[in-house]
């Protein structure tokens, strides 16, 4: 549903710019017409991305996050999202149900995010926090341990943050300790 809405929004935006492009060309403003044409190309790239993701349901973003203030140093969440902005999912998880926002250790696109996530879950199965409900994707592991397994599965990672920033937690602790 989110992707359908995104596609409809992009198509509406493209139609608007195509109409404007015609009007600008009628006025003979080729410089502005080129700018509008570039915007249309960017929108078409966005539409192609949505179409690709709709056709490839295994594609998505794998994330590794932690919440030092809520769960301590040795608990991570390993999940996947197909959201257009994967940080929306991370922000959603850090809503009012936990005292601090989650820190992102890894967040990357994969053509087969389903398999990458499943393999990570398999490798950490004996460290699953909730052994009754497997949809709860929390594991007793450090970010460094997850990184080690992720490199074996995925290869080189563009970015991985081992030490959580935990800005609000650390600031809160400093106030408590003072």
Predicted region positions:
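Non-catalytic accessory segments flanking enzymatic or RNA/DNA-binding domains
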Residues: 1-178
């Amino acid at each position: 549903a989110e992707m359908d809405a995104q596609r409809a929004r992009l198509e509406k935006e493209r139609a608007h710019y195509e109409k404007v492009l015609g009007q600008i060309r009628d006025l003979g403003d080729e410089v502005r017409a080129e700018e509008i044409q570039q915007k249309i190309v960017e929108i078409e790239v966005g539409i192609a991305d949505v179409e690709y993701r709709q056709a490839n349901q295994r594609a998505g973003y794998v994330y590794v996050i932690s919440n030092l203030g809520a769960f301590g140093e040795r608990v991570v969440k390993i999940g996947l999202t197909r959201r257009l902005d994967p940080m929306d999912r991370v922000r959603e998880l850090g809503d009012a149900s936990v005292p601090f926002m989650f820190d992102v250790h890894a967040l990357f696109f994969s053509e087969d995010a389903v398999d990458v996530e499943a393999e990570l879950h398999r490798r950490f199965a004996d460290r699953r926090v909730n052994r009754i409900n497997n949809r709860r994707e929390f594991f007793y592991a450090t970010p460094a341990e997850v990184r080690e397994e992720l490199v074996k599965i995925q290869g080189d990672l563009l970015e991985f943050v081992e030490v959580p920033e935990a800005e609000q937690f650390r600031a809160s602790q400093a106030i408590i300790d003072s």
